[in-house]
A protein has these predicted regions:
Chain A
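Short, functional C-terminal segments
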Residues: 1, 143-196, 200-201
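Long, charge-rich, low-complexity alpha-helical segments
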Residues: 1-166, 221, 226-281
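Low-complexity, glycine/alanine/valine/leucine- and proline-rich hydrophobic stretches
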Residues: 174-241
């Protein structure tokens, strides 16, 4: 066998969801000859057996490590989802996920990158979604928290700088959200579910359905989040594309009226500066 | 189950060779783990303020470093943990780089894969190296994935001439990309191939010679693989060319049925200490690192392991603070006199 053939065979056996022995049986069953024991002979021709352990047992060590290592990382990444669907449910989820989305990144940090999408959209998850319709949103929220933790740094626009600027200077600044800020919209009340899940409670759907707009960000190396009303969410969405504060105020005036807009915009600005969401583009 | 063999006859070991210029003896280090960030950085800052420890010129010309306040001479960072866009991981690298000699140790170079080398990975590693200015860049002599699918494990390679040629060519390309030599670590393994045409030590040596790279000799991995495959750990240690050994790793392992597993969740075992002593007798003082990755103990407990390594190096080679071989050193005698668990920062 070439090196590529050797590595491909080992990779497939190690990643087989039901273990090496089951993978060998399935390989025999799906081969044109349907010859029992053929795959095992292929394995034994490749990997040495001895009196202490046969080839299948030796490869099984790597197979067990493969699943348990990734499972451990994903459990740490998605604690509230684990709390919601339970240990067995999460094991099944990860088994199905890895079949469809094997890790493509050299780093385990990104092994869970597509879990929320898989949970929300893949056909294999239809029954899971039927039982826990909020699980996909919860996973997306937990991933966003991971994502901002080590997102790119940048110069935060702070109160100090703003206070040194003349109003007309500030008005000319083109403002953006920092790389460490994420805006997310969810169909379910993820913040309540997440709080329950990370407090050791089982996150349950309380019937308080409805969209949740959330901003997630990093400040002083800690990850924060808070819910947004529709107007602040829209304002931050504008800023995510870049905007002068004056333009934002003009938009707010259309939405809120000339009287209410300046006060609301000032309140927003104070909060955004305090949270460290803004940068100058 | 392979019979355990008597491991040592130190009398037949030979004299230490000169160290390669790009593989200085940094002394004894530990792998930096998240749970120790706060303590290590605080000890380092206190040392940098002159409240404890020594400021030592490490010979790099880059900066003075403060080592004795943390009880070890250098730290190893797991490369992939810091190959991220920003946030705390990169702040940790910047702070550590200012205070301590560092090594970068990767697990995903995938040097033995039949897949092409990944330019994006090498770019990220190069960027991290520019930030960390490490004394060593190391990874493992193994493959970790194929067809762009990662197993996140250190998979053994067949020991054949074809694989030697394949891997050595890739190592040379990596070294060209990074502009420096790297060192590859022998891995613990639980399987071997019927096609193996040579011993593991001949395979490791051939790649190092062919690629002109270093060997990171993991003594625990030698012992684990020797046990698992019924080979002679002493012969392995004695067969590795001394001038190729850039660094030594020490760690603990676990037992699973008839095999040993490289779990890094226990103290270094007595038999591994014995093998280490044999290696040091033969190699002389080599940068040595304690790895502890799971069930991570207190920093003070980790230092006890580092002190054991230091004591062996000192006893066997006479190396100590101020030794010509020691480009970075520390006042280990003061430290080793302290009671475990009551460690204080040392002022030399």
């Amino acid at each position: 066998m070439s090196l590529h053939e050797t590595q491909t065979a080992i990779s497939e056996w190690v990643r087989a969801p039901k273990g090496v022995a089951a993978a060998l049986e399935e390989e025999d069953a799906s081969s044109p000859q349907r010859e029992s024991g053929r795959a095992k002979r292929r394995l034994e021709n490749l990997i040495r057996s001895d009196e202490s352990l046969d080839a299948s047992g030796r490869l099984g060590i790597y197979a067990n490590a493969y699943f348990s290592r990734i499972l451990g990382v994903l459990r740490a990444d998605y604690p509230a989802v684990v709390g919601m669907i339970g240990d067995v449910g999460f094991n099944d989820l990860v088994t199905s996920y890895l079949l469809v989305e094997p890790s493509r990144s050299p780093s385990l940090r990104y092994a869970g990158l597509r879990l929320a999408d898989f949970l929300s959209n893949h056909d294999a998850m239809a029954r899971t979604r039927a039982r826990w319709p909020e699980a996909g949103d919860l996973a997306a929220f937990e991933w966003a928290r991971i994502d901002v933790f080590d997102a790119a740094d940048g110069p935060v626009l702070g109160r100090e700088l703003v206070s040194r600027l003349a109003p007309e200077e500030f008005a000319e600044l083109f403002l953006c959200l920092g790389e460490w800020v994420r805006l997310r919209a969810f169909a379910h009340p993820v913040l309540q579910l997440w709080r329950a899940g990370t407090n050791g409670e089982i996150p349950r759907f309380q019937g308080t359905s409805g969209e949740a707009h959330v901003v997630i960000w990093r400040q002083d190396e800690k990850v924060f989040h808070r819910s947004l009303d529709a107007l602040e969410e829209a304002a931050l969405a504008k800023l995510s594309l870049g905007s002068r504060f004056d333009d934002l105020c003009e938009w707010a005036a259309i939405e809120l009226g000339d009287e209410a807009a300046p006060g609301q915009a000032a309140t927003w600005l104070e909060r955004w500066l305090s949270d460290g969401l803004l940068v100058v583009a | 189950m392979p019979a355990q063999r008597p491991l040592l006859n130190l009398a037949d070991s030979s004299v230490s060779p000169a160290r390669p210029a790009d593989a200085p003896n940094l002394g004894v280090g530990v792998g930096l783990r998240t749970s120790h960030y706060a303590e290590v950085l605080e000890r380092g800052r206190r040392g940098a303020r002159g409240e404890s420890g020594d400021r030592v010129d490490d010979g790099s010309g880059a900066q003075a470093v403060c080592v004795t306040s943390v009880g070890v001479d250098w730290f190893e960072l797991l490369s992939e943990n810091y190959m991220v866009p920003g946030g705390r991981p990169l702040r940790i690298v910047r702070e550590m780089q200012e205070m301590f000699p560092l090594a970068l140790h990767g697990v995903s170079l995938n040097i033995g894969s039949s897949d092409p080398l990944r330019p994006a990975y090498l770019d990220a590693l190069d960027a991290l190296a520019r930030l960390a200015t490490p004394r060593f860049i190391t990874d493992h002599l193994c493959w970790t994935g194929v067809s762009e699918t990662n197993l996140h494990d250190l998979m053994p390679l067949p020991y054949t001439d074809e694989v030697i040629e394949h891997v050595a060519a890739r190592v040379r390309r990596v070294q060209d990309r990074l502009g420096r030599r790297i060192a590859l670590e022998n891995v613990s393994s639980y399987l071997s191939f019927n096609d193996d045409a040579m011993s593991e030590w001949d395979f490791v040596t051939a790649i190092a010679e062919e690629a002109d790279c270093g060997i990171l000799l993991d003594i625990n991995n030698v012992y684990v693989s020797a046990h698992n495959h019924g080979i002679d750990a002493m012969k392995y240690i004695d067969s590795i060319p001394a001038e190729r050994v850039f660094q030594i790793h020490l760690a603990g392992h676990s037992t699973s049925g008839s095999l040993l597993i490289d779990t890094h969740d226990h103290p270094v075992t007595d038999v591994v200490w014995t093998l280490f002593e044999r290696a040091i007798k033969r190699l002389g003082p080599v940068s040595t690192l304690i790895e502890w990755d799971d069930q991570i103990p207190t920093y003070a407990r980790l230092l006890e392991e580092a002190d054991k390594a230091r004591a062996i190096i000192e006893r066997v080679t006479g190396w100590s603070s101020g030794s010509p071989n020691a480009s970075v050193s520390s006042s280990s005698k003061s430290r080793t006199s302290e009671s475990p668990g009551e460690r204080r920062d040392v002022t030399a």
